[in-house]
């Protein structure tokens, strides 16, 4: 049985869709799914949604939810990261500040000045997560779904080239 840790599991759409897709693979149907988020309310919503997917699909998978990142990561075989490092209200400034200075931003969280703003806020959090991965599940495969994806993946590769 594989253990898959979802860090930032409160991202309802991503988590629900990824779990649903993951469970279509026979080798993953008995997985232990460890949901982790710092927002207790959102974590509760996602836990109920994932429990429903498991129940309705009659999968033998197990699901836990925690606000403790170490608990979720311990002995994980895979780590899926879908975090938002700051409240969504902060994200608005990534669009409005460049706009005020007439800097065109075609995609507000992946490229241009806006993407750099978000990357600078998110990199320290991502690197902390990867430090924990190295400590608690060093053989895990890490899948990042957090934007700006390319900047964050590059930072992780430079800091931790041995993480998969």
Listing of model-derived features with the role each one plays in the protein:
Residues 4-33:
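N-terminal Rossmann-like dinucleotide-binding module
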Residues 9-14, 40-42, 144-152:
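Gly/Ser/Thr-rich loops at beta-strand to alpha-helix junctions
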Residues 26-28, 53-60, 160:
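Short helix-capping segments at alpha-helix termini
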Residues 3, 32, 62, 164:
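Residues at the starts of beta-strands that form the adenosine-phosphate
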Residues 54-78, 84-87, 105-115, 119-122, ...:
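A structured beta-alpha segment of the ubiquitous adenosine-cofactor-binding alpha/beta core
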Residues 27-51:
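NAD(P)-binding Rossmann-fold cofactor-contacting core
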Residues 92-109:
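A short, gly/pro- and small-residue-rich
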Residues 127-134, 138-164:
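Rossmann-like dinucleotide-binding core of oxidoreductases
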């Amino acid at each position: 049985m594989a253990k898959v840790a979802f860090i930032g599991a409160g991202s309802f759409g991503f988590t629900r869709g990824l779990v649903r897709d993951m469970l279509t693979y026979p080798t993953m149907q008995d997985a232990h799914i460890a949901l982790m988020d710092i927002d207790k309310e959102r974590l509760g919503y996602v836990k109920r949604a994932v429990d429903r997917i498991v129940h309705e699909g009659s999968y033998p998978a197990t699901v836990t939810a925690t606000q403790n990142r170490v608990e979720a990561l311990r002995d994980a075989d895979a780590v899926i990261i879908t975090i938002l490092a700051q409240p969504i209200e902060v994200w608005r400034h990534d669009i409005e500040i460049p706009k005020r200075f007439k800097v065109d931003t075609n995609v507000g969280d992946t490229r241009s000045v806006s993407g750099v703003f978000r990357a600078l806020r998110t990199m320290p959090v991502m690197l902390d997560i990867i430090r924990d991965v190295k400590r608690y599940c060093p053989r895990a495969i890490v899948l990042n779904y957090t934007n700006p994806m390319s900047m964050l993946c590059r930072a992780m590769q430079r800091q931790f080239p041995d993480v998969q």
